[in-house]
Amino acid sequence: MKKLILLFSLFLAPAFSYKENQKINQNFSSNNTSHKRLKRDWIWNRMHIREEIDSPLPHHVGKLTSSVGNKNAMYIIEGESANTIFKVQGYDGDIYAFERLDREKKAEYELTAHIIDRRNNRSLEPPSKFIIKVSDINDNAPIFVQKIFNGSVPEMSRLGTSVTKVTAEDADDPTVAGHATVTYQIIKGNEYFTVDDSGVISTARADLDRESQSAYEIIVKAKDALGLTGESSTATVIIRLTDINDNFPVFKHPSFHFRVPENISVGGEVGRVKVEDIDEPQHRNTKYSFVRGDYRDTFEIIANPFTNEGIIRPKKPLDFEKVAEYRFDIEATDHNVNPAYYKPGGSRSISTITIEVTDVDEPPVFTKLSYEFKVRENDPEIKTLGSVWAHDPDAAKRKIRFARRRASPNGDYVRVSDSGIIQLPKPLDREFSSLYNITVAAQEILEDGRLSDRESHAQVHVIVTDENDNAPELVYPEEPRVCENAAPGKVIIRISATDKDEISPGGFFTYSLTTEDSNFSLTENPDNTANITVKDGQFNRELAKIHYLPVIISDNGNPELSSTNTLVISVCKCNEKGDFTFCEERAKQVGVSVQALVAIFICIFTIIAVIALLILLRKRHKKDLSGLRRNVAEIHEQLVTYDEEGGGEMDTTSYDVSVLNSVRKNGIKPEVVPSAYAQVQKPPGNTTSGAGEMEMMIEVKKDEADNDRDLLPYDTLHIYGYEGAESIAESLSSLESGSSDSDIDYDFLNDWGPRFKMLAELYGSEPNEDFVY
């Protein structure tokens, strides 16, 4: 009866608390002049929920309330099954269970409630713990959950040390008066251990020695308040004595300091913290956790199972520019130490960790790992597509220079400036390539103007969109042939077309003939093809074995393009069934596209230009040679004659070189000699062998010079000194010319014109005064 009254008072306590708080709040509101701040308390109903409720989920458990008058207040819970089985409505405090509960598995849940400001997550009130109990009915006798229980106790434990707990399940709630209460009794081994009504087995002696007896087997009996027992109301408990683990790990130093570069890899080792544990190795099971400065999203502490050290590792990349130093506290504890062995100093050891992040020269960081640009093909106006951008993540904030590193086979048509601008040196052709890929590198510019060795990369993709710039071309699978006796309407061949441009879903080709006078007709098909059929028939191989049929193919692009293609149709002999029996094979002839014609014209123009260039160079070479030869002629422009007494003004007689050059103009020997020149008269025959050979040689050389188109006039005549054995005039020197007794007649020199005036005066008898000198 006392238990019933106690439980009833606990149930009513929150209600009285709620009324008392209302009264306090009313008093606070009525006293506007008071500046005293009243304490605000948590208020909620005691929460119970029955197991295996049949109604749909979720099930309402209770309501969290508080006297905080903040409209931005929000409730949150944590603890056992918080936010999994139990969830709270953040704004009104209603708690719901999202799973059907089973009291036989868990009878109660301990949770903690918080109330925070949802704007800044600041706590408005201290957290408070509460329990959600699962109730059931009393309809079963107690049954042990297992037939054999195992327990252990440290050796030499004091009297009453808890060893283990046995559990017998009963549908009744042992905490509620009036329901069946399970009690336990040891029927074997009660001289060493005792059991209480909750099923906890404790030591009955303080001198249990593991070395004397390492294990005990006892039998426990369970019954309810009515004394109901069943066949499964007894269980065996095996208790083993273990070595004592009565010491907690302790940090060797109150603080640890580590320095790591910011480019440390995720999962790399930052440092190790060491603890001391004087227990045996099998008792060392240190656990590390964060206490202050919660950086568990940045670092993790893993215990080394062999050395018991705590290894600190980063869980994500570090950034010196964002956080240069981390400071937090960690604790080391051993959850396996029995609470009965707690010693002064507590079960926790705390140490302060300082991690200093050092700066590392990092490569530039692109704003994106991949850039994509689209450009219309053959557009001469587009020179710049856009730009890529990267920045220096370090504190120096250096300038960045961009460069192209790698490119696809066609990527040379895309360039990158130092500032990251993507440029096109010339329009792109989608038919040549529809996609251009390049890799852009970013490097920092150092203070001395050099580029940093570290660089980062980004991909640039240039997509070329199509325009209608290619005319369709004719496609047919085989050589077209027609029988002489083909009937009108006979289909000769089905033709189709192809287009290098993209064909839109609504694209189509139009076929037509250039003339209606042929013996063929064209019919378009719905599938973008056309049939070539016989129009009138009555072909005659004797008249024409080959028919050339021009076909015009147009697309529906913008602008519309077309091409003329020629079908070469052979007329063949056929049998009565229409099978070909004899037909000359002809090479397929189709129209030449505009691109092919342009290529042909370019080749022809190139050949002509090369030939013209060669001719020009040859003429220039001749001009240079002629300049040199004129210099030689100018040197020999004067014929100088020396004799022993001096010739006076007659020693040098000038003559005009242009007169000599005019003898043969443009390489053609003039047929009419100017009046100023006398025709050369051959001297009469002379039996003297020396004079004849000299005359013949000079004449031959003169004729060769006159007929040589490649030599200039001043190269044609030379002074030859003939020293043959039978030469009569052995020398042209004036020392002998005057006293020569030769009977050779040199008067013919007067007939050779002014060019030979000096020779005529030296060797001739009478100069011709009619010559114009």
UniProtKB/Swiss-Prot annotation:
Residues 19-40 form a propeptide. Ca(2+) 1 binds at E51, E52, D102, E104, D139. Residues 41-595 are extracellular. The chain crosses the membrane at residues 596-617. Residues 1-18 form the signal peptide. It is found in: Cell junction, Adherens junction; Cell membrane; Cytoplasm. One of its GO terms (cellular component) is cytoplasm. Keywords: Calcium, Cell adhesion, Cell junction, Cell membrane, Cleavage on pair of basic residues, Cytoplasm, Glycoprotein, Membrane, Metal-binding, Repeat, Signal, Transmembrane, Transmembrane helix. Residues 39-144, 145-251, 252-366, 367-474, 474-582 form the Cadherin domain. Pfam families: CADH_Y-type_LIR, Cadherin. Glycans are attached at N27, N31, N32, N121, N150, N263, N437, N519, N531. Ca(2+) 3 binds at N138, N140, D170, D172, H179, D224. Gene3D superfamilies: Cadherins, TCF3-CBD (Catenin binding domain). Ca(2+) 2 binds at E51, E104, D136, I137, D139, D172. SMART domains: CA. N-glycosylated. It is a single-pass type I membrane protein. One of its GO terms (molecular function) is calcium ion binding. PANTHER family: CADHERIN-23 (PTHR24027), CADHERIN-5 (PTHR24027:SF89). Three calcium ions are usually bound at the interface of each cadherin domain and rigidify the connections, imparting a strong curvature to the full-length ectodomain. This is Cadherin-5. The gene is CDH5.
